[in-house]
Design a protein with these regions (language model features):
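Transmembrane alpha-helical segments of integral membrane proteins
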Residues: 154-170
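Generic transmembrane alpha-helix signature in multi-pass membrane proteins
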Residues: 29-35, 99-103, 115-118, 123-137
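Juxtamembrane boundary at the C-terminal end of a transmembrane helix
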Residues: 2, 6, 191-203
Length: 203
């Protein structure tokens, strides 16, 4: 029982860590291009996007964990690692596509099917997996960090979306309006997080 509670505690502690102190967007710049695309896109629900991203991260984590252990004994693990992890992401994406295709006639099924490529084929997914393996996370740490990274991405989307509404002031020079001021805002938020965690990442 103690082992189970300890594993659950590790899972949630790494999830919280990934949401705030090690936010994929603000500390490593993962998925920024996709985030900028989401802001202002009323066709794509940020909530459904984050849900698919979280599911993808959690499903990829165990696959990448065991695949990483398998290739560790190979002659060139560093060269194989990105290819193997891309294959893990592809397998999970195919599984999600099959499930959503079967449910496409149900409520939100078609919308989720359209969002799936945006959420699954994302540098945030592959980058998070590479961080997990580079830091030699355990299985529960990897899954918790994956879930937290997805939730942290949602937090970043919400913050940038709110900023997009507020940064339409006439006081902002025309040359900075739109994407430039959005990137400046993301940079300021990243610096604020560095103020809590220090310049180097804490993992």
């Amino acid at each position: 029982m103690n082992d189970v509670m300890q594993a659950v505690g590790v899972f949630f502690s790494y999830a919280v860590l990934a949401v705030f102190a090690q936010n994929a967007v603000f500390t490593r710049g993962l998925g920024v291009s996709r985030l900028v695309q989401l802001v202002g896109d009323e066709r794509t629900s940020s909530g459904w996007f984050a849900l698919l991203l979280c599911v993808t991260q959690v499903l990829v984590a165990p696959l990448a964990f065991y695949a990483g252990g398998f290739i560790a004994a190979r002659p060139n693990p560093a060269q194989l690692r990105p290819l193997v992890f891309l294959a893990c992401v592809a397998v999970v994406s195919l599984f999600e596509f099959i499930v959503l295709w079967a449910a496409r006639g149900k409520r939100h099924g078609g919308q989720l099917l359209r969002i799936l490529p945006l959420a699954a084929v994302n540098s945030g997914v592959l980058g998070t997996v590479l961080v997990e393996r580079a830091q030699s996370f355990t299985l529960e740490q990897s899954m918790g960090f994956g879930l937290g990274s997805g939730l942290g991405y949602l937090l970043a989307v919400m913050l940038v979306t709110e900023a997009d509404r507020r940064l339409r002031s006439e006081a902002i020079p025309e040359a900075f309006r739109g994407l430039p001021i959005t990137l400046v805002y993301i940079g300021v938020l990243a610096l604020a997080i560095y103020g809590f965690t220090g310049h180097s990442v804490i993992l």
